Amino acid sequence: MAVNDPIADMLTRIRNAVMAKHERVEIPHSKMKVEIARILKEEGYVRDYAVRGSGPQQRIVIELKYGPDGERAITGLRRMSRPGRRVYRKQKDIPRVLDGLGVAILSTSQGILTDHEARRKGVGGEVLCFVY
């Protein structure tokens, strides 16, 4: 089955795996998805990620993170910019997620960045998703 929005598919797979308390989730590979996984790891939302396989069978394996009592590190994932409705923001208009407790992931001219990095570098871009 063809996926019209690969980023939304990635976020949905992660959301479903977290709700089902899975240890890891496998996602079809793309460069943008690897960058999103990198940001999720840097921000402490996932334990680790790895790219497995080669060629068209390449996959991203994301190890999910839970607290000592099984509480989820990711409580919410929300897709903002979609293929049918793109959302772009200037540097001064980049939204704060839960007053800074969450993170917005943006696609900018300088690569895939968090809202904090984009503000610091003075760039705007397409708001891909919110993570909290």
UniProtKB/Swiss-Prot annotation:
It comes from the Bacteria. One of its GO terms (biological process) is translation. The keyword Ribosomal protein applies. Keywords: Ribonucleoprotein, Ribosomal protein, RNA-binding, rRNA-binding. PANTHER family: 40S RIBOSOMAL PROTEIN S15A. Part of the 30S ribosomal subunit. Contacts proteins S5 and S12. This is Small ribosomal subunit protein uS8. It comes from Rubrobacter xylanophilus (strain DSM 9941 / JCM 11954 / NBRC 16129 / PRD-1). The gene is rpsH.
